[in-house]
Amino acid sequence: MAKQARAVQTWRSIVDAAASVFDDYGYERAAISEILRRAKVTKGALYFHFASKEAIAQAIMDEQTSTVEFEQEGSPLQSLVDGGQQFAFALRHNSMARAGTRLSIEGVFLGGPHPWGDWIDATARMLELGQERGEVFPQIDPMVSAKIIVASFTGIQLVSEADSGRADLRGQVAEMWRHILPSIAHPGVIAHIKPEGRVDLAAQAREKAEREEQEARIAAEAKGAGSDAATDSGSRSGGSGLRGGGSGRGPRAGGAGDEGDEEPAGAGVAAGGVVA
């Protein structure tokens, strides 16, 4: 259990550090050495979890698509507005959201699925739900409108970044909705939509930070419990720490590929177990 908690904590450290590096430098200029420095992990630990820089970037992209969740209950259009405002807030305060957006704009994954596809599909589904519930005009094409909405948001956040470091992004997103809503929704519905969003995003962010802090504390406690158990076991066996070939290092819990290795599995070790 302690080893598993450590692995999760290491994975999290690598992804968070990589997000800040990609946010600062973009994909091409991001260096593995800088990710290692910010994550405070070894090269072996990084390659235990990720085969390449692209794999790390993909993990960030996957996290970005989970940043916003659209509520299925209530007004589909208000849920779309709230989701957009939630992501605008994340772009201001969350390096993971900024890194994922920058990677998408840079077109890092041109060989795979388009990075905007999940956003467009999710938006189209909410517009379809809006049609079913009588909020959205029946004659509009949800997919076409979804592409316009996602493209508009993308352009607005780029301009906001250049103008104010995204300080005015939420206000600009509200203006975007004031322009788009009349073309897709009934006037009676628009009167009840709040373009600024209806969620206290600051309170929501505080709650999320508290949850993450609690999870990190639990993981650290589990790691400490595992270390205590290992110490007790070593004391009962004589405490020499010399096993196998008597190297003084002892076998790693996960074998040659354990995340604590200084290099990827097998690197630096010659035949017979002698360090090269």
From Swiss-Prot:
Consequence when changing residue 138 to A: No loss of DNA-binding or A-factor-binding activities
Gene Ontology cellular-component terms listed: cytoplasm
Please tell me whether the keyword DNA damage is annotated for this protein.
Answer: no
Q: Which Pfam families match?
A: TetR_C_45, TetR_N
Q: Low complexity composition bias: which ranges?
A: 221-235
Q: What is the effect of changing residue 160 to A?
A: No loss of DNA-binding or A-factor-binding activities
**Region annotation Disordered: residue ranges?**
207-276
Changing residue 155 to A has the effect of: Loss of both DNA-binding and A-factor-binding activities
| Superkingdom to which the source organism belongs | Bacteria
Q: Which SUPFAM superfamilies match?
A: Homeodomain-like, Tetracyclin repressor-like, C-terminal domain
What mutagenesis or variant effect is reported for residue 115 to S?
Answer: In mutant HO1; lacks DNA-binding activity
Domain remarks in the Swiss-Prot or TrEMBL record: Binds DNA through its N-terminal H-T-H motif and binds A-factor via its C-terminal region.
PANTHER family annotated for this entry?
Answer: HTH-TYPE TRANSCRIPTIONAL REGULATOR BETI (PTHR30055:SF234), HTH-TYPE TRANSCRIPTIONAL REGULATOR RUTR (PTHR30055)
Q: What does this protein do?
A: Represses adpA expression by binding to the promoter region in the absence of A-factor, causing repression of streptomycin production and of sporulation.
Instruction: Cite the record's note on assembly.
Output: Homodimer or multimer. Binds to both DNA and A-factor as a homodimer.
Q: Tell me what this protein is called.
A: A-factor receptor protein
| Taxonomic path | Bacteria, Bacillati, Actinomycetota, Actinomycetes, Kitasatosporales
